[in-house]
Amino acid sequence: MNRTVQKLLPWLTASAQDVEKVRNESIRLDPILMVAVLALLAWGLVMVTSASMELGERFGNPFFFVIRQTIAVVIGASITVWLVLRQPIALWVEYKLWILIASLLLLLVVLLPGIGHSVNGANRWIPLGPVNIQVSEFARLGLIIWMAGYIATHTIKLQNRITGMLGPGVVIFAASLLLLLQPDFGTTAVLAATLFAMAWLARAQWQMMVGSTLVMGVLGVFVVLSEQYRIERLLSFSNPFADPFGHGYQLANALIAIGTGGVWGRGLGESIQKLSYLPEAHTDFIFAVLAEELGLIGVIALIGLYGLIVWRGFVIANMAWKENQIAGAALAWGISVWIGMQALINMGVNMGVLPTKGLTLPLMSYGGSAMIVALISLGFLMRVHHEAAMVAELREAQMTKRQQDASIRTKEVLS
């Protein structure tokens, strides 16, 4: 316990009584964040049920997918409660190198013949009994944790030397290359943007940031132009109704769903497009089903909930930064940017603003790996809030004690 407190508060000394009092209290949860997360979780299960019942009939149970999704929620919540919330961020930072190695190995192993499982031409899954694990989800969280640890241990170097971004640049390039070999362009874009955003928020040298961004941009353009299907995606998303039964089929049906939803929607469970017209209605395109059933009002409410999560994430990051909890602040930045960016991209794809990326809507779309990782990530965010609040309380306790000691000494002098 003392070692943990020392890692959390290397600059602060507090009485053993104060430390024990604060440590024995329950985890300090952000109430607004908790409400937003629980609301999205409950809403997501309802929408998965609505969007997948027709497809579930093919497996002999209309609730086939929501049952599996509920199991993923239970697993993710259990890991969060019994592991993530109970361990200090300093512990994860201490093992950041091993987390980095494990993350890159996951991205490499999935490419090996006989290990990785291919779906629609993409090697993104590793079979594990009756389920398939999407390794990029876990690797992304691992890389965000590593980046947070790197920022915490190299803050001065990042802020004052151009070479400060060299290590992260190499890691981002290696991870992006492995992801593109799957291929998974959407996750590559989100991961690279998230890690760069973390460095930028930590005030990294802009010259290296610009250089790394240009290199990644050139690589991205090359990857897009190297495959005919990616070029066709770019062309079809700009006008899906030019080929509504070919490359534009999925987006055309998504736009029909969103358009027919209007302001108030058709009503929960009343979507027409989910009835085998819209592919991936319960996964990547669940937003279109939501817009059709709940209309513009539902869309605004959904955006509002994601906005609350991102806002609270940055508030928590600011709390941690002020209390000199650099790793916690960086981790909160990364998780907030990732969730907000992925939600915006998914909604943009559904509305035809962006080309199809194959990204799920966090906490809403069907997907066990994505759900488990999202809950674990939000658990880290809550842990950062707890530690920042704990440090603030210890600091205030120390200030109060100093004031009391000063008052006692003053009285003794006057007497």
Swiss-Prot record:
Keywords: Cell cycle, Cell division, Cell inner membrane, Cell membrane, Cell shape, Cell wall biogenesis/degradation, Glycosyltransferase, Membrane, Peptidoglycan synthesis, Transferase, Transmembrane, Transmembrane helix
Pathway: Cell wall biogenesis; peptidoglycan biosynthesis
Transmembrane segments: 31-51, 63-83, 97-117, 133-153, 162-182, 185-205, 206-226, 245-265, 285-305, 326-346, 361-381
Catalytic reaction annotation: [GlcNAc-(1->4)-Mur2Ac(oyl-L-Ala-gamma-D-Glu-L-Lys-D-Ala-D-Ala)](n)-di-trans,octa-cis-undecaprenyl diphosphate + beta-D-GlcNAc-(1->4)-Mur2Ac(oyl-L-Ala-gamma-D-Glu-L-Lys-D-Ala-D-Ala)-di-trans,octa-cis-undecaprenyl diphosphate = [GlcNAc-(1->4)-Mur2Ac(oyl-L-Ala-gamma-D-Glu-L-Lys-D-Ala-D-Ala)](n+1)-di-trans,octa-cis-undecaprenyl diphosphate + di-trans,octa-cis-undecaprenyl diphosphate + H(+)
Keyword Lipid biosynthesis set for record: no
Main location: membrane
Protein name: Probable peptidoglycan glycosyltransferase FtsW
Provenance organism: Halothiobacillus neapolitanus (strain ATCC 23641 / c2) (Thiobacillus neapolitanus)
High-level lineage: Bacteria, Pseudomonadati, Pseudomonadota, Gammaproteobacteria, Chromatiales
Gene: ftsW
